[in-house]
């Protein structure tokens, strides 16, 4: 009887080669933190060490959960079946809808850098668990002729935050497993020496970094969470952070992280995950904060816009809602989709909230100071924002918020118009 075998390269094909880039990968990890009931998600980029650290204060993982869920491909990580228990929840918080369902988050890490150290501590369980530590070198999964079962992923448990000596011991286990593959001639000498050099150069001390970085992510005394230490980080992260110095457009990181939650529309839900990104450009402890909430649209600015369109499209594509012109005249509108013939739409019903700012100051009711500020933000961040359960949905796995090219069309054809658009509470089926 024959059976399917899975080459290790399948993970590379499903992960790194399917993710649009580092910002998209980070977005997937934030969604995983959301699903783990985290309140905070911090990103620290230490340029001098070429190290990216991502930390959340969520529920974390036990050793069994890490091995049976995180290291298992497919949707079982988020869904229950007869042979596995439901993912843990934090009963002290409102239940959160699951954002990630296909295991993309764990594979997306390979799009950020070639090696990752995972440190996780489970909390709110029936008993106190030790800290779980694992190390993965993604270069191994690029090698031809190796099956998944040939690759060893060392998983250790510690009662303390692991230090440099602990990590060196884990790295040596990986090198020894590669040496065995080399002796079996499953990998050649050149690949073995190359990957061995990469593993040896991985210099991370989680204990020391926990003291050095911003506090609030302790993994002792009943606290929990998951932390990723990724190094080396791919060079594209620099352009993702800095963008084009000659352009006013938002950088790729800003595009991805600004507006992750809906904070624009009145009465929006309170964001459940507070996201921070610190860029340490020197070795003196100083950093640049990449995410400044004041740089994005505020509720007050959204309401200042000249015109508003708010309502709902039903399952047949009919729009029903309010239209407010220059903040004064309000009209009830019903717009039928004449050519639909009572067929239900594929996306289902959804709500829309659109704010429109006149492209010229003389045509706007907004004062000079506010107009200049809102228009500058519109030029940088304006576009279509789609939210499901108050978390932005990204088209085609990319960070482009203007994927319908609304702003581009407007700039090319009608220079006197600019848009500030927010799409919220989209119920996609």
Q: Which residues are covered by each model-predicted region?
A:
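GHKL (Bergerat-fold) ATPase N-terminal catalytic module, capturing the glycine-rich phosphate-binding loop
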Residues: 1-240
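N-terminal assembly/transducer modules of large multi-domain enzymes
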Residues: 34, 142-429
């Amino acid at each position: 009887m024959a059976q399917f075998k899975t080459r290790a390269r399948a993970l590379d094909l499903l992960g790194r080669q399917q993710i649009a880039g580092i910002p998209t990968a980070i977005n997937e990890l934030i969604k995983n933190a959301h699903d783990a009931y985290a309140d905070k998600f911090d990103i620290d980029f230490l340029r001098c060490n070429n190290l990216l650290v991502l930390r959340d204060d969520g529920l974390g993982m036990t050793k069994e959960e890490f091995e049976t869920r995180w290291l298992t491909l497919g949707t079982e990580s988020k869904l229950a079946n007869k042979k596995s228990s439901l993912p843990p929840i934090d009963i002290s918080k409102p239940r959160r809808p699951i954002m990630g369902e296909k295991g993309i988050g764990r594979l997306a890490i390979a799009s950020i850098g070639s090696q990752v150290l995972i440190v996780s501590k489970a909390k709110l369980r029936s008993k106190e668990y030790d800290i779980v530590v694992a190390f993965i070198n993604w270069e191994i999964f690029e090698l031809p002729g190796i099956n998944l079962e040939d690759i060893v992923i060392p998983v250790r448990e510690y009662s303390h935050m692991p230090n440099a000596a602990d990590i060196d011991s884990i790295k040596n286990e990986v090198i020894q497993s590669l040496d065995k593959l080399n002796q079996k001639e499953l990998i050649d000498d050149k690949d073995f020496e190359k990957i061995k050099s990469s593993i040896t150069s991985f210099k991370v001390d989680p204990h020391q970094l926990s003291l050095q970085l911003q506090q609030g992510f302790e993994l002792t005394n009943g606290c929990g969470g998951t932390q990723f230490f990724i190094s080396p980080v791919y060079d594209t992260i620099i352009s993702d952070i800095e963008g084009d110095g000659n352009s006013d457009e938002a950088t790729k990181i800003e595009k991805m992280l600004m507006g992750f939650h809906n904070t624009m529309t009145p009465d929006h839900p309170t964001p459940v995950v507070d996201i921070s990104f610190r860029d340490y450009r020197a070795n003196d402890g100083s950093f640049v904060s990449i995410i400044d909430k004041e740089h994005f649209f505020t509720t007050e600015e959204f309401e200042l816009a000249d015109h508003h369109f708010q309502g709902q499209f039903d399952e047949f594509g009919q729009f029903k809602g309010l239209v407010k012109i220059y903040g004064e005249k309000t009209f009830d509108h019903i717009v039928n989709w004449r050519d639909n013939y009572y067929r239900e739409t594929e996306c289902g019903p959804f709500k829309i909230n659109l704010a429109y700012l006149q492209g010229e100051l003389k045509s706007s009711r907004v004062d000079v100071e506010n107009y200049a500020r809102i228009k500058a933000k519109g030029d940088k961040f304006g576009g279509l924002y789609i939210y499901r359960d108050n978390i932005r949905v990204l088209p085609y796995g990319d960070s482009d918020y203007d994927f319908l090219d609304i702003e581009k069309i407007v700039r090319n054809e009608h220079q006197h118009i600019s848009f500030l658009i927010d799409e919220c509470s989209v119920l996609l089926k």
